[in-house]
């Protein structure tokens, strides 16, 4: 992957780091206050982090659109995306998610698996594999993996502080009533 240019911004779910290449937005990380995210640290160690010379205009547009999203003024991101770090299956599934599950909507892992089969590459994957792809999504929020839920609850989330962030995002988008408690009984 081409070296990334990084920008950061504050958000209601904590600090975010956005990485861009000349081809598009390639990474979005939830950051610990004052530090790098677990994924960012691991990928920088693998030679995928750093500061490159990607378009400052693209980085600025990504930060602006994320700020608009959190201000309730944007429901869909209109940014070029750099999929070069994704496998064919990841690209297919994440593209289907990006194109078919809108703001305020959810889909189950099984629903997304069925939609991916119907996509242009016709990738057939079990729901569990869809969950793994959601967990490795390089562009959370922009490619809205938080909108993919289990058939019997919220499922997991690897961004930020985990399931609390997913719950907050779904409530923010109106897909989950603020009073609904999805925690397992006895938790």
Regions found by a protein language model. Give the residues of each.
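Basic nucleic-acid-binding alpha-helical/helix-turn surface characteristic of O6-alkylguanine DNA
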Residues: 1-121, 172-187
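N-terminal positioning helix adjacent to the helix-turn-helix/winged-helix DNA-binding module
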Residues: 89-93, 126, 165
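Short, positively charged loop/turn segments that connect secondary-structure elements
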Residues: 117-132
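Flexible, gly/pro- and Lys/Arg-enriched active-site loops
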Residues: 122, 156-162
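Major-groove DNA-recognition helix of helix-turn-helix-type DNA-binding domains
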Residues: 133-136, 140-143
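Charged low-complexity interaction tracts in eukaryotic proteins
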Residues: 142-158
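A short, Lys/Arg-enriched interface patch at domain edges and termini
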Residues: 160-177
């Amino acid at each position: 992957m081409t070296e990334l240019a990084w920008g950061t911004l504050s958000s209601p779910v904590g600090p975010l780091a956005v990485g861009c290449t000349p081809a598009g937005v390639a990474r979005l990380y939830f950051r610990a206050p004052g530090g790098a995210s677990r994924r960012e640290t691991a990928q920088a160690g693998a030679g995928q982090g750093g500061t490159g010379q990607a378009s400052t205009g693209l980085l600025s547009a990504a930060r602006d659109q994320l700020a608009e999203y959190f201000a309730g003024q944007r429901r869909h991101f209109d940014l070029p995306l750099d999929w070069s770090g994704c496998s064919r299956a990841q690209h297919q599934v994440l593209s289907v998610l990006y194109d078919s599950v809108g703001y305020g909507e959810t889909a189950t892992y099984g629903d997304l698996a069925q939609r991916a089969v119907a996509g242009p590459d016709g990738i057939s994957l079990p729901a569990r594999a869809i969950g793994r792809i959601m967990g490795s999504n390089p562009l959370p929020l922009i490619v809205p993996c938080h909108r993919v839920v289990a058939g019997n609850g919220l499922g997991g989330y690897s961004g930020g502080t985990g399931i609390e962030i997913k719950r907050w995002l779904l409530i923010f988008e109106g897909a989950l009533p603020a009073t609904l408690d999805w925690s397992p009984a006895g938790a």
